[in-house]
C-alpha cells in the first residue's frame, strides 16, 4: 500500500443527525458523512434516553443487530463505541483516545451508528458527534 496523505491540519467538527419520529421503543440506524474516514471522538450528545453504538462499517452494524445491550460485542466485530444516555445528561465524553475509522472496502467517509430507544411516547432523537478529523480523503 502506498503512502496516504493526511489532511494538512486536523480539525474539530460537529455533525448532527435527527431520527424519524417513532411512537414506541425503536432501533434506528444513522450515518454520519462529514466526519472524514478516521478521527477521534471528543464528545457525543443525545437529547433523549437511548443507547448509541458506533460502527466501522454498515456490515458491522448489520451483524450487531441481535446483540443485547447488556452484552459486550465480540473482539474485532467492528463496534467502535457504546454509549448509554439517561435523558438527563445530554453530553458524554468518551474515554481519551476513543477513535473511529471507516472499515469498508472501498474506503468511504462514513461513520455508522445505531440508536436504541426505550420510550413509549412519540419521540425523535437528535444525535451529535464532536470529533477531531485526522483523515478525511478517500484514495482514488
Ranges and model annotations:
Residues 4-24, 105-110, 114-140:
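C-terminal interaction-tip segments
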Residues 5, 34, 43, 53-57, ...:
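Intrinsically disordered, low-complexity regions enriched in small/polar residues
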Residues 9, 30, 39, 48, ...:
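Short linear motifs in intrinsically disordered/low-complexity regions
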Residues 14-18, 23-62, 134:
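Beta-rich globular "head" domains
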Residues 31-33, 78-112, 116:
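Beta-sandwich interaction modules
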Residues 53-96:
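Terminal beta-strand-rich extracellular "head" domains
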